[in-house]
């Protein structure tokens, strides 16, 4: 635990000033002249971007049908010490709105979007900045971009899809940008427009992170919302499974980090990596000798010390290169395994066990009073219309 706390302190001391500097430069508009490092959050319309950002920030962002994010939203999260009070601020153009409670965020952002893009369904490339300072958020800055839509609806401009894609592309095509692509788990990932755009500007996937947003609770609410008892019980079970799966995945990831502390000196892969590094180092030394022969001759007077230091450096490089490669492969695989496979299987098994309890089936399927009344009304209407049809049929005869 002490090592984790030391790492966090080191991060806050070294990384936080860099994030603050980038945020300051972006606020000054330097991004028009220079590409600044950024994490851009993209996704198809209603892909679950808001849920991801709300989980990180702890505040409610604008939601609804259609295009909700109509301006790029720079979400600046700053971690405070335990006991310090939550603070927030929304900035756009020359306007700054101080916030004292998380519940004020949604309305403030909506006002900012209406001010910049107008009241309606248009979009703008002007930034809205949301600063959130809290003990419960990470030190992080994200840029939330409008959700991708294919077809204009209602009063939307006919070329709204093209406008959004053009806006997104201005961010994700920069080499300094990491693209966080949010994909709902209940669709074919290969067909998502956001992922296609990310692959187009980053074919190797070096700057792209895919985040699969589970939709179990959403599907439950949409399809079984009338059965309140079933919904409440199922949501409780889903939350319990999610927490257990998170704990199991975390333990497995920690185990992989512990395993990487072991140096496999006899491992063929490690030996190959070490060989490659040695060849590169030798090539560098040859180049240095050609450029500056005098320096090379002076260094050769201390062969033993130089060789020992060089060997240690080469082993360290080989070890960390293999660690990075192994962790880069295994950690995403573990996360995908738990999200896409075991989580769904556990929910399916739990729901089947739930419905096998015959003593509670009638309680689970008990409808809300307004649903029962609606059904009675529809039945009476159906009877009236059926009688009217029969009378009309007799009249025509």
UniProtKB/Swiss-Prot annotation:
Pfam families in alphabetical order: Dynamin_M, Dynamin_N, GED
One MF annotation (Gene Ontology) recorded for this entry: GTP binding
SMART domains documented for this protein: DYNc (SM00053), GED (SM00302)
Coiled-coil segments: none
One Gene Ontology term, aspect cellular component: nucleus
InterPro entries: Dynamin (IPR022812), Dynamin_GTPase (IPR001401), Dynamin_GTPase_CS (IPR019762), Dynamin_N (IPR045063), Dynamin_stalk (IPR000375), G_DYNAMIN_dom (IPR030381), GED (IPR003130), GED_dom (IPR020850)
Domain of life: Eukaryota
Biological process according to GO: innate immune response; response to virus
Recorded family membership: Belongs to the TRAFAC class dynamin-like GTPase superfamily. Dynamin/Fzo/YdjA family.
Protein name, as recorded: Protein Mx1
UniProt organism field: Mus musculus (Mouse)
Gene that encodes the chain: Mx1
